[in-house]
Amino acid sequence: MKEQKWIHEGLITESLPNGMFRVRLDNVDNEDLILGYVSGRIRRSFIRILPGXRVKIEVSRXDSTRGRIIYRLRNKDSNB
């Protein structure tokens, strides 16, 4: 059976080498940063992820310190 994953929204705080990012989750009580990597669909689509951007991240129940960035959210303050 496929492993269940949590999906959270968060804020990119730091860009690391090899498509890795530090992400601060919104709906978690503690202020821990988790390590996020970019999903293949985002890589193929050449979607730019920069510090300050809001993302959806998929976190495994077994290892809650790492996650996969699956979607970049639009900025609320832009006129798009």
Curated annotation (Swiss-Prot):
Ranges for domain S1-like: 1-74
Places the protein is found = Plastid, Chloroplast
Q: Name one Pfam family in it.
A: eIF-1a
Q: Which keywords does the record carry?
A: Chloroplast, Initiation factor, Plastid, Protein biosynthesis, RNA-binding, rRNA-binding
SUPFAM superfamilies in UniProt:
Nucleic acid-binding proteins (SSF50249)
**Gene Ontology CC, one term:** cytosol
Molecular function GO terms recorded: ribosome binding; rRNA binding; translation initiation factor activity
Keyword check for Magnesium: no
Q: What is its main location?
A: plastid
Q: Which domain of life is it from?
A: Eukaryota
* 4Fe-4S in keyword set: no
Q: Which InterPro entries match?
A: NA-bd_OB-fold (IPR012340), RNA-binding_domain_S1_IF1 (IPR006196), TIF_IF1 (IPR004368)
> Which function does this protein serve?
One of the essential components for the initiation of protein synthesis. Stabilizes the binding of IF-2 and IF-3 on the 30S subunit to which N-formylmethionyl-tRNA(fMet) subsequently binds. Helps modulate mRNA selection, yielding the 30S pre-initiation complex (PIC). Upon addition of the 50S ribosomal subunit IF-1, IF-2 and IF-3 are released leaving the mature 70S translation initiation complex.
Its family remark reads:
Belongs to the IF-1 family.
Q: What's the subunit arrangement here?
A: Component of the 30S ribosomal translation pre-initiation complex which assembles on the 30S ribosome in the order IF-2 and IF-3, IF-1 and N-formylmethionyl-tRNA(fMet); mRNA recruitment can occur at any time during PIC assembly.
According to UniProt, the name of this protein is Translation initiation factor IF-1, chloroplastic
Q: Give the organism the record lists.
A: Illicium parviflorum
Taxonomy of origin reads: Eukaryota, Viridiplantae, Streptophyta, Embryophyta, Tracheophyta
Gene that this sequence comes from: infA
